[in-house]
Amino acid sequence: MAALYTSNAQLFPTHSDIVSGTEAIQKFWQGVITSGVKGATLTILDVDGQGDIAYEVGKYALTGEGGKGLDNGKYIVVWKRVQGKWQLHRDIWNSSMPMSGH
């Protein structure tokens, strides 16, 4: 998964600190998989850019075992073209579900 990101990429996950660099990003996504996330659906709402930078705006839905809905929300990704290859450079998302206890 980390291979999709630039070498100095950053994640900005819901309810979490910034995750920086490919090693930390790989560890983060491995933790997501270990936590029970089995699938993700992304719905792209907008894409635009110029030169070697582009952005993508969309919605996501995460599912667990048996297709059980785990989370849904929205995201923005900044893409960067590095040596002719588009990679994720900044990846931010947040849940649309209410926080527990609220």
Regions found by a protein language model. Name each.
Residues 5, 60-62, 92-95:
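Short beta-strand segments enriched in hydrophobic/aromatic residues
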Residues 1-2, 9, 21, 25, ...:
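Hydrophobic pocket/interface hotspot
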Residues 3-7, 87, 99-102:
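Short, low-complexity N-terminal intrinsically disordered segments enriched in polar/charged residues
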Residues 4, 9-20, 31-37:
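A short gly/proline-enriched turn/hairpin at secondary-structure junctions
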Residues 72-97:
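Short beta-strand edge/turn micro-motifs at domain boundaries
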Residues 24-69:
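Surface-exposed, charged secondary-structure patches
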